[in-house]
Regions:
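Intrinsically disordered, low-complexity regions enriched in acidic/Ser/Thr/Pro/Gln residues
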Residues: 1-62
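A glycine-rich, hydrophobic loop/mini-helix early in the fold
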Residues: 47-95
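Ligand/cofactor pocket segment of small-molecule handling proteins
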Residues: 98
Length: 98
């Protein structure tokens, strides 16, 4: 399997700014960004009240192939959230039962 990695340098938000983002509801953040770079509203927390806030590390792979996710875990840094694009495929999980 070939995994293509794109390493992009970008300015990270400070811990203070990230702490302020934690208090902003996702719908408000989405509206402020004119709904650009937001996920589908069909994606929801695994349990009520669950929240996460961090820098996204995006992953795209072929249907049924979780190899890119395994690579991303080794590359991700503390505070990053893995966002996996399953290309709309809902019959197969990209990571266990999630």
């Amino acid at each position: 399997m070939v995994v293509q990695q794109h390493r992009t340098k970008f300015e990270r938000l400070s811990a203070d700014v990230m702490a302020r983002w934690k208090n902003i509801p996702p719908a408000i953040a989405s509206d402020c960004m004119n709904r650009c770079y937001v996920m589908s509203g069909r994606i929801s927390p695994l349990s009520p009240g669950m929240k996460i806030c961090g820098h996204a590390r995006t992953i795209t792979g072929m249907v049924g192939d979780n190899g890119p996710a395994h690579v991303a875990i080794g590359v991700a840094t503390p505070g990053e959230i893995l966002v996996i694009d399953a290309r709309g495929h809902v019959e197969t999980a990209v990571w266990g039962g999630i």
